[in-house]
């Protein structure tokens, strides 16, 4: 009888949860020109298997009406200063705030208001040239490892837990501290990678999820996704070529072929560009749209005459590259193990997209700056559960297709298309039409009709 009662007790007693998050103690934020913003400190676990705690700074814009919930936002980056971003973008949340608090946090490891920041070089990292042989690849991997080790020595345990999945766990700790059973999540740009990671780890906690101008971190086949991105970029190049004078495509192909044989000088930038670098710099000049495309035509003309200086984005940083050092990205995306891996990818993508090829960050910059990284990729791309509630996404010429590949995985989801250039419609562009649809979706769980467009 005693054994029976004990067994029943085990079956009927709730499994004890992890230690509850403490209630947040809100006070003023150390952010200029954001008097409505309130901040609080939140201790979170460094990792699921660690007893160590780190402190996150959390911020909110309080609801202006009767509060019915909270919405968590990450503006992208993927670096810090999310709280400053919220403080400078309060107006886009006016409708959401009629019934919800808007909450963000400065992410772990980065400069900002949260504790436990890594002491790293967060500046510009030049994209390496594709290595010609295995010896060149090995030298590149060794240099990357040395750069990563220099950062890692400041806090090895934190460095090893900087992936978007760790951010997603931090987001769920914020949800719990807010006392919310389910969360509304806005993931903008790289914030969409964090949102997808959250959806994989905590699908039962998602009430609504909006992704804007994000990459697809949820494919079943990463190689196939790289091919899709190459096609997306080639379509953008196609818009430019249709706009440009007749014969521009033929001239462009001849120019990059010439640069692949012998780099073209850019004396005003004190640089020389090979074909891949020209492809990458041209892609960056495509993104602003037709108002700046004349500059690209002029750059092509000057380079044909032997001076590629007009391709430089600035004299200080004339070569392609990205800021941030890869501390998060190297843990979130696959990396090559050999020079042969790199060569195969380049050959395949150039066949898919002859005008731009592999000259985009996820095929060039990240693989070549993450090869040899001292921490393995702990949060590689993987599909999201199809049991999630319908998502909402939005995108421009540059990123509509990749965002669509995220949301179309979940039945009933919707997309908003902006037929124009730009990036991050809700946050950076503050598109009124998009803001209206997102606000309605988050507060009422009402999705726009299929085929919705915003000017």
Predicted features and spans:
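Catalytic-loop region of hydrolases
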Residues: 2-6, 11-138, 252-255, 375-378, ...
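Conserved acidic catalytic loop of the alpha/beta-hydrolase fold
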Residues: 153-157, 168-182
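Hydrolases whose catalytic domains are alpha/beta-hydrolase-1, hotdog thioesterase
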Residues: 194-198, 402
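Alpha/beta-hydrolase fold active-site neighborhood
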Residues: 248-391, 430
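Catalytic histidine-centered segment of alpha/beta-hydrolase-like enzymes
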Residues: 421-432
């Amino acid at each position: 009888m005693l054994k029976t009662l004990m067994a029943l007790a085990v079956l009927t007693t709730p499994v004890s949860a992890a230690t509850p998050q403490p209630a947040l103690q809100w006070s003023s934020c150390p952010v200029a020109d954001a008097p409505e913003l309130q901040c609080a400190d939140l201790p979170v676990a460094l990792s699921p298997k660690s007893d160590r705690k780190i402190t996150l700074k959390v911020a909110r814009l309080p609801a202006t009406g009767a509060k019915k919930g909270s919405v968590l936002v990450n503006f992208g980056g993927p670096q810090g200063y999310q709280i400053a971003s919220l403080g400078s973008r309060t107006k886009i949340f006016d409708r959401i705030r009629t019934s919800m608090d808007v909450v963000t946090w400065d992410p772990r490891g980065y400069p900002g208001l949260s504790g436990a920041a890594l002491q790293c070089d967060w500046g510009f990292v030049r994209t390496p040239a594709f290595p010609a042989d295995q010896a060149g690849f090995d030298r590149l991997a060794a240099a990357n490892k040395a750069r990563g080790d220099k950062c890692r020595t400041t806090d090895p345990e934190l460095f090893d837990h900087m992936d978007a999945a760790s951010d997603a766990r931090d987001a769920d700790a914020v949800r719990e501290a807010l006392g919310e059973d389910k969360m509304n999540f806005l993931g903008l740009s790289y914030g969409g990678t964090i949102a997808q990671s959250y959806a994989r780890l905590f699908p039962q906690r998602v009430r609504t999820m909006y992704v804007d101008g994000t990459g697809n971190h949820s494919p079943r086949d990463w190689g196939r996704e790289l091919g899709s991105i190459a096609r997306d970029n080639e379509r953008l190049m196609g818009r430019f070529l249709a706009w440009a004078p007749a014969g521009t495509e033929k001239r462009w192909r001849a120019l990059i072929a010439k640069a692949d044989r012998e780099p073209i000088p850019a004396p005003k930038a004190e640089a020389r560009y090979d074909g891949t670098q020209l492809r990458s710099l041209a892609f960056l000049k495509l993104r602003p749209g037709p108002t700046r495309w004349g500059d690209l035509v002029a750059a092509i003309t000057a380079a044909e005459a032997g001076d590629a200086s007009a391709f430089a984005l600035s004299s200080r940083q004339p070569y392609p590259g990205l800021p941030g050092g890869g501390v998060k990205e190297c843990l979130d995306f696959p990396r090559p193990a050999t020079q042969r891996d790199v060569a195969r990818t380049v050959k395949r993508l150039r066949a898919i997209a002859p005008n731009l090829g592999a000259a985009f960050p996820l095929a060039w910059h990240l693989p070549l700056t993450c090869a040899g990284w001292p921490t393995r990729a702990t949060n590689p791309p993987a599909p999201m559960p199809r049991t999630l509630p319908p998502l909402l996404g939005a995108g421009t010429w540059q990123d509509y297709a990749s965002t669509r590949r995220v949301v179309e995985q979940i039945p009933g989801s919707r997309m908003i298309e902006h037929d124009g250039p730009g990036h991050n419609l809700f946050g950076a562009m503050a598109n009124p039409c998009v803001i209206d649809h997102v606000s309605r979706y988050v507060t009422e769980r009402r999705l726009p009709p299929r085929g919705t467009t915003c000017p």
